[in-house]
Amino acid sequence: DVLVRINRPLRMAVADIESSIWPEVCGLVLPKVDSADQINFLCEIITELEEERGLDIGHTKLMVLIETPRGYSNVRSIASSSKRLSAIALGQEDFSAEMGMLEPEGMSLLSYYQTVQVAAREAGILPIGYPGSIAEFTDLDLFRSNAMVARRLGFDGGACIHPRQVPILNEAFTPTESEINRAEAMVKVYDEAMAAGDGAVAFEGKMIDVPVV
C-alpha cells in the first residue's frame, strides 16, 4: 500500500493533496495535526478530489501525527474526528523538541505514547509508534528493544526512516509461531470449558475467561 506524507503549511498541504488523490494512493500521512477542525477541513478537500477523479468516497485513508502540545491536548477529538482515520502516532522527534526534551528517549516519551494509544483504542483506530527515536538506524539493538516494548504495550506497528529498520519492525509486530500456538491452545482449553458449562478455566496456572480469550 502507498501512503503519501504531505507537508504541514496549509498551502503546501493543499498542493500535496491535489497531487496525491489517485487510485494508486491508499492514504495520506498528516503531520503536525493540532485539532479535529484541521482534519475536517482537509477531508473536505479530499472528498472533492475523490468525486472529481471517480474514486469511491472514503478511498483515501488517513494516518495522523501528533507532534505539538496542542495536538496532544486534543488527541481524543482528533482520533475520532473522521471515518477516514485508520491510525494515529506520536511524532517523537518533533514532539520532544516542542516539549524541550534533550532527546526523544523511551522513558521520557512513554506516558505521552500511552495517552495517544488510549485515544486510538477509544476511537477504534490503530495506535502506531514506539518509545525512543525514529532516527535510530545505527544502534539496531536499541531500535529492536524499543519496538518490542511497544509490542508488549499493545501498539500495532511503527514507522521507519531507513531500510535497515523495516525487518526489525516486521519481526517485532508479527506474532511468533510460539505465540500463535499458545493462543490456539488457550482457545481450545476455553472452548472445552464452555462446552462443559464452566465460565472460567485455568490455563498455564492462571485463570482465563472471556476478557482474556
Locations of the language-model features?
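Expand to "…catalyze enediolate/carbanion chemistry for C-C bond making/breaking, isomerization
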Residues: 1-213
